[in-house]
């Protein structure tokens, strides 16, 4: 096992990784920007190093500074967390060049799955169903219009290198496509350095179901069942749960086996997630693969009893999985909500100083958090400030705990999405599990 791990991240995920490393006796190295000089992760780690200015490009996205810091601290591995550099193949390659273990898959797999077009091609080759569409980069606007008319409107215009909803837009007709195409192409080029676009058919009234995978370096791959992430705003998840209320045992087995087959086909290692879109008839289609730990990994941990960060560390250190598929059992129901520092109606970020902060303290409620009273939420980074996870023996029990905990959650000084979460959890549709990716638009 590793002696010292540098965490190339911030916020709650840095705290989460530090917690597992500490339990395993692994020393931790935190990195921080000027804006984060007093952040909790800098105090929780064994060592902490300033890596740059507040701007993310000058700190958490600065590959060479992070590598230099890892060497200075004599870290033998780097955990990228999620977001930031976690799916940057160049970062993984630089770690490899410096003989620092990157806790994740190989650089070539990150690159392949990072290109949504290449990922579609790989899944098609593996016999995994993909959303009807094209697996080639679109050329000019005329080519895009021809392709869309062949598929049939409405279509989803997507950036090949995209993520977090950036460069993605639903278009209803040719006129809308012409308006959207160049803007999204430019946005993708600006954000990701790749303006390649492709088109997929819109699956109406769909659910977003993803499968958590673990794969060691010795050919063993298992799935840890599914998560339902259908409650979204602007193509970003807000509420996630495991298991899905929509997935029956037959679909669970089928979608899990398909995800394992897909991971094996590309030679995947470490923790990963395959996201599927599922229609009303339970047909499922590959959307994308996330080659990192997911924000919503705690709901899987709660129902399986496994520490996914520990498994990542063990796999990266060359250990074999100590369990097989049949050993993994589901227990209970878990729901996660993301607490964002944002206006609950407009979704605009709400930076500022937290003047009061208290977390609900009840059995079956878990908090992943990196803010406190007097913490400053800056405009430089993602507005998610915390996650709350509830677990019950049944979904009904979990929802009851969720509603109670949300009412007891207190954040003052900034706006948050807590009112939205309270409303969502109280709806008849959510309680009945009648949730699609249109849920927030339809019910709130």
From Swiss-Prot:
Q: Where is the Biotin carboxylation domain?
A: 1-444
Cofactor mode of binding and number, as noted: Binds 2 magnesium or manganese ions per subunit.
Record-linked SMART domains: Biotin_carb_C
- Give the PROSITE patterns listed for this entry: ATP_GRASP, BC, CPSASE_1, CPSASE_2
Q: Where does Mg(2+) 1 bind?
A: 275, 288
Report residues binding Mn(2+) 2.
288, 290
The protein's enzyme class: ligase
Give the matching InterPro entries.
ATP-grasp (IPR011761), BC-like_N (IPR005481), Biotin_carboxylation_dom (IPR011764), Biotin_COase_C (IPR005482), CbamoylP_synth_lsu-like_ATP-bd (IPR005479), PreATP-grasp_dom_sf (IPR016185), Rudment_hybrid_motif (IPR011054)
**GO MF, one annotated term:** acetyl-CoA carboxylase activity
* Residues annotated for Mg(2+) 2 binding in this entry: 288, 290
Q: List the EC numbers from the record.
A: 6.3.4.14
One GO BP annotation here?
fatty acid biosynthetic process
> Can you tell me which residues bind hydrogencarbonate?
237, 292, 295, 338
Swiss-Prot/TrEMBL catalytic activity: N(6)-biotinyl-L-lysyl-[protein] + hydrogencarbonate + ATP = N(6)-carboxybiotinyl-L-lysyl-[protein] + ADP + phosphate + H(+)
Binding-site list for Mn(2+) 1: 275, 288
- Enumerate the spans annotated as ATP-grasp domain: 120-317
The membrane-spanning stretches of this chain are: none
Active site (UniProt):
292
Keywords attached to this entry? ATP-binding, Biotin, Fatty acid biosynthesis, Fatty acid metabolism, Ligase, Lipid biosynthesis, Lipid metabolism, Magnesium, Manganese, Metal-binding, Nucleotide-binding
Pfam families xrefs: Biotin_carb_C, Biotin_carb_N, CPSase_L_D2
What cofactor is needed? Mg(2+); Mn(2+)
| Binding-site residues for ATP, renumbered to this chain | 116, 158, 164-165, 200-203, 208, 235, 275, 288
- Share what the entry says about its subunit structure, partners included: Acetyl-CoA carboxylase is a heterohexamer of biotin carboxyl carrier protein, biotin carboxylase and the two subunits of carboxyl transferase in a 2:2 complex.
> What is this protein's function?
This protein is a component of the acetyl coenzyme A carboxylase complex; first, biotin carboxylase catalyzes the carboxylation of the carrier protein and then the transcarboxylase transfers the carboxyl group to form malonyl-CoA.
What the entry lists under PANTHER family is as follows: CARBOXYLASE, PUTATIVE (AFU_ORTHOLOGUE AFUA_5G07570)-RELATED
Any idea what this protein is called? Answer: Biotin carboxylase 2
Q: Which species is the source of this protein? A: Bacillus subtilis (strain 168)
């Amino acid at each position: 096992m590793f002696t010292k791990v540098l965490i190339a991240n911030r916020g709650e995920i840095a705290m989460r990784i530090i917690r597992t490393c500490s339990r395993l006796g692994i020393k931790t190295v935190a990195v921080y920007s000027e804006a984060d000089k007093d952040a909790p992760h800098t105090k929780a780690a064994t060592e902490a190093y300033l890596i740059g200015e507040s701007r993310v490009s000058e700190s958490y996205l600065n590959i060479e500074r992070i590598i230099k810091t890892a060497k200075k601290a004599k870290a033998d591995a780097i955990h990228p967390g999620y977001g930031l550099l976690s799916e940057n193949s160049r970062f993984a390659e630089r770690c490899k060049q410096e003989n620092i273990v990157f806790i994740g898959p190989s650089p070539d797999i990150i690159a392949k799955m990072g290109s949504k077009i290449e990922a579609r091609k790989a899944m098609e080759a593996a016999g995994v169903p993909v959303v009807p569409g094209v697996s080639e980069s679109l050329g000019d606007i005329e080519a895009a219009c021809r392709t869309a008319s062949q598929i049939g409107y409405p279509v989803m215009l997507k950036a090949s290198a995209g993520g977090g909803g950036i460069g993605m837009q639903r278009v209803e007709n040719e006129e809308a496509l012409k308006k959207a195409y160049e803007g999204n192409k430019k946005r993708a080029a600006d954000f990701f350095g790749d303006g390649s676009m492709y088109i997929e058919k819109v699956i109406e009234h769909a659910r977003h179901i993803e499968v958590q995978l673990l794969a060691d370096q010795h050919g063993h791959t298992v799935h840890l069942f599914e998560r339902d992430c259908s409650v979204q705003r602007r193509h970003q998840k807000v509420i996630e749960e495991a298991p899905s209320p929509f997935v029956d045992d037959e679909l669970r087995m089928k979608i899990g086996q398909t995800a394992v087959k897909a991971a094996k086909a590309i030679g995947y290692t470490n923790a990963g997630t395959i996201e599927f879109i599922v229609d009303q008839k339970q047909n499922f289609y590959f959307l994308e693969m996330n080659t990192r730990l997911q924000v919503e990994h705690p709901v899987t941990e709660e129902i399986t009893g496994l520490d996914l960060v520990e498994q990542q560390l063990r796999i990266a250190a060359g250990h074999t999985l100590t369990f097989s598929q049949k050993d993994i059992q589901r227990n209970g129901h878990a729901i996660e909500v993301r607490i964002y520092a944002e206006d609950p109606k407009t979704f605009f970020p709400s930076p500022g100083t937290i003047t009061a902060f208290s977390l609900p303290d009840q059995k079956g409620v878990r908090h992943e958090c990196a803010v406190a009273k007097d913490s400053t939420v800056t405009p430089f980074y993602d507005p998610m400030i915390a996650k709350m996870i509830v677990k019950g023996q049944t979904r009904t029990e979990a929802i009851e705990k969720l509603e109670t905990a949300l009412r007891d959650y207190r954040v003052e000084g900034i706006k948050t999405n807590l009112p939205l979460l309270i409303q969502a959890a109280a709806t008849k549709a959510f309680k009945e599990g009648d949730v699609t990716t249109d849920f927030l638009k339809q019910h709130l």
